[in-house]
């Protein structure tokens, strides 16, 4: 029953009105399309079942402008549905007034139209040309800035091929084979093999190798290094310090470089293991010169002190690259400031040490960044720095951004010597433990030792004379005591013999 009442009420009241509204709205569409509607009026139609139904017209006094969020501000809708800007409308009104006031003929008005339109076009073209000139000037300035400071991206596409100066013969030779067999028998690792150093044949054939302690597995994952990584590497070999000292003392060498993997899993970072190795080598062969290329020990002062006072001659730790590229190249646990801090502290703990660092080039650094790194190293009292070309060990590592020319390596060397570095090894194939640096370090350390010996020589002579006098007195005393003891023993035996006879 209720349903019927609702149906009849809807058909009587609502349906006729909706048809009426639909017809009106269809006949009187919005004047946007200009369908026979007065241009000074816009019809708004609203219909709703719930609200009171009305139709109303809103009159606009200015003209039928329609608001738009653009640069022109408004759009005009004429009877033909053609859009025009407000500026054009004002121009048309001014033109009509001028024509009516002067009462000129059609030819003059047409000519004036042409002149005005041409002037308007010229002004518009001039504005566009000025805008283009502004953009071209900005682009030219940006290009000049980019030319001045062009920072390459880390990990860019590899250059097509290596230059000629990187071609190195395959490692071979009797000393190379002997050294490799000796290392294999004693289960010792070398960074030469693990890091795929290009100088392995040249160095091993003259009896120079860089021993790697604490195993062959690193706890850090730097993006330039090919050494194995693991968060839980095997524990260090207890016999490794003894085996290393034994092997080094058997080789006919006077300079040895000892390095290690990072061992963040150990409480001291492996500093005590390192120091024991140095102490055993120095005890067996005091004349040998030892360079230790170590990790940062996470900035632990006790670890740095333990190694710095172990008897080594050169304390080396590599910065690896410029400050900006640290997070892209090195492990996140290593950083630029910490590396400089370690070298500075080692020098403060033992001023007799020579500190040394190394930087790889070709990773995307700029010349200014390299020079700034050299200044930072020198301000932290670093004595020796080396520069070498980064070479990608495998396809899974960082790409080489560029190959640095030998001329640029020589430039960095000259600038570094002027800064006050005691020595710089700089070249495409130079590495932190390259033999050219070792030759110099050997001479430099020996000069330092000779200077110390010359300073304490008079004291040593006095000590020698005093020792000679003491030894003579001791020998006389021993002889005197030996005679007295012999007499006493002889008298005792005589007395015993007499008693036995009795």
UniProtKB/Swiss-Prot annotation:
This is Lipoyl synthase, apicoplast. Binds 2 [4Fe-4S] clusters per subunit. One cluster is coordinated with 3 cysteines and an exchangeable S-adenosyl-L-methionine. One of its GO terms (cellular component) is apicoplast. It is an enzyme of class 2 (transferase). GO terms for molecular function: 4 iron, 4 sulfur cluster binding; lipoate synthase activity; metal ion binding. It catalyses: [[Fe-S] cluster scaffold protein carrying a second [4Fe-4S](2+) cluster] + N(6)-octanoyl-L-lysyl-[protein] + 2 oxidized [2Fe-2S]-[ferredoxin] + 2 S-adenosyl-L-methionine + 4 H(+) = [[Fe-S] cluster scaffold protein] + N(6)-[(R)-dihydrolipoyl]-L-lysyl-[protein] + 4 Fe(3+) + 2 hydrogen sulfide + 2 5'-deoxyadenosine + 2 L-methionine + 2 reduced [2Fe-2S]-[ferredoxin]. Pathway: Protein modification; protein lipoylation via endogenous pathway; protein N(6)-(lipoyl)lysine from octanoyl-[acyl-carrier-protein]: step 2/2. [4Fe-4S] cluster 1 binds at residues 192, 197, 203, 433. It comes from the Eukaryota. Residues 204-422 form the Radical SAM core domain. Residues 1-16 form the signal peptide. Belongs to the radical SAM superfamily. Lipoyl synthase family. SUPFAM superfamilies: Radical SAM enzymes. Its EC number is 2.8.1.8. It is found in: Plastid, Apicoplast. The gene is lipA. Pfam families: LIAS_N, Radical_SAM. The keyword Metal-binding applies. [4Fe-4S] cluster 2 binds at residues 218, 222, 225.
């Amino acid at each position: 029953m209720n349903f019927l009442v609702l149906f009849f009420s809807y058909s009587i009241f609502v349906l006729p009105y909706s048809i009426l509204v639909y017809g009106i709205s269809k006949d009187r569409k919005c004047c946007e399309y200009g369908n026979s509607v007065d241009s000074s009026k816009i019809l708004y139609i609203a219909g709703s079942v719930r609200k009171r139904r009305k139709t109303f017209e809103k009159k606009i006094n200015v003209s039928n402008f329609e608001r738009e969020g653009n640069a022109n501000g408004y759009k005009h809708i004429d009877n033909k549905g053609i859009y025009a800007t407000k500026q054009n409308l004002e121009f048309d009104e001014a033109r009509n007034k001028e024509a009516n006031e002067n009462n000129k003929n059609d030819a003059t008005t047409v000519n004036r139209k042409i002149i005005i339109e041409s002037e308007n076009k010229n002004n518009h073209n001039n504005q566009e040309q000025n805008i283009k000139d502004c953009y071209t000037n900005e682009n030219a300035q940006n290009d000049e800035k980019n030319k001045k400071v062009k920072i390459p991206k880390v990990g860019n596409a590899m250059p097509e091929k290596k230059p000629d100066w990187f071609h190195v013969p395959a490692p071979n030779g009797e000393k190379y084979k002997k050294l490799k067999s000796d290392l294999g028998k004693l289960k010792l690792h070398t960074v030469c093999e693990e890091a795929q150093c290009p100088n392995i044949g040249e160095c091993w054939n003259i009896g120079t190798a860089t021993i790697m302690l604490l195993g062959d597995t690193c706890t850090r994952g730097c993006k330039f290094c090919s050494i194995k990584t693991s968060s839980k590497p095997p524990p260090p070999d207890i016999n490794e310090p003894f085996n290393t000292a034994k092997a080094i003392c058997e080789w006919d060498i006077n300079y040895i470089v000892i390095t290690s993997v990072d061992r963040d899993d150990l409480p001291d970072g492996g500093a005590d293991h390192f120091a024991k190795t140095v102490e055993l080598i120095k005890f067996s062969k005091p004349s040998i010169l030892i360079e230790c290329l170590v990790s940062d020990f996470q900035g632990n002062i006790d670890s740095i002190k333990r190694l710095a006072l172990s008897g080594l001659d050169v304390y080396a730790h590599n910065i690896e690259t410029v400050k900006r590229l640290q997070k892209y190249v090195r492990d996140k646990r290593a950083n630029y400031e910490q590396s400089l801090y370690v070298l500075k502290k080692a020098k403060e703990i033992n001023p007799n040490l020579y500190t040394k660092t190394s930087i790889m080039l070709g990773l995307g650094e700029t010349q200014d960044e390299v020079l700034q790194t050299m200044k930072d190293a020198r301000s932290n009292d670093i004595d020796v720095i080396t520069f070498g070309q980064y070479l990608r060990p495998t396809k899974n590592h960082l790409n080489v951004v560029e190959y640095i020319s030998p001329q640029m390596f020589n430039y960095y060397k000259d600038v570094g010597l002027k800064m006050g570095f005691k020595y710089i090894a700089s070249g495409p194939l130079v590495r932190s433990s390259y033999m050219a640096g070792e030759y110099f370090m050997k001479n430099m350390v020996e000069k330092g030792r000779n200077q110390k010996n010359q300073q304490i020589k008079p004291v040593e002579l006095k000590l020698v004379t005093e020792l000679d006098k003491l030894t003579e007195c001791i020998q006389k005393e021993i002889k005197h005591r030996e005679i007295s003891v012999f007499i006493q023993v002889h008298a005792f035996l005589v007395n015993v013999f007499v008693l036995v006879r009795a």
